[in-house]
Amino acid sequence: MCIRDRVDRAVTAALLSAFIALKGGDMVSLFSFDARPRVTSGAVRGSASFAMIQKRAAEIDYSSEETNFTLALTTLSAKLDRRSLVIVFTDFVDPISAELMLLTVGRLTERHLVLFMMMKDVELETLADMPPAAPEDVARAVTAGNLLRERQVVIGRLRLLGAHVIEASHQRLGPALVERYLQLKQEDLL
């Protein structure tokens, strides 16, 4: 799945959860970033606010700029004046970005409930599990397996920091988010 499709799936899942939250009377805010914050809606409440959230979500686009988690999550944290559920849609591309993200997340989880949404990387899983037919297939499988292990290490560290993590297929991203949101509400964690 190309990066643009991943962004579209994440935005669709965010809109689905925003709709459910607004219908339930909760406040919702949309915040998007890459190297710097790009889209922010401010906090809104009520079903009538969904059109504005949709309009702001339409401004979210793919960017080739490297994600700056430190700047974005620090900026977001400064805007939040009460304990909030912060949902972060992301994929980990390299260990350095992941390490910087982990440093910032640790500070964010001290005050907020943080939920990471990630799409399963079916392509990597397929490469890692594919029986080799040629020598280069072995190298691809080993590399894919290493990347998947690195991803699991980061997920484990996020959980140790107190963040919740959902890894779902692209088809289940929205429903999985709504299910977890409703579960967190039912458990009175919000």
Spans of model-derived segments:
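Exposed, interaction-prone extracellular/peripheral surfaces
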Residues: 4-190
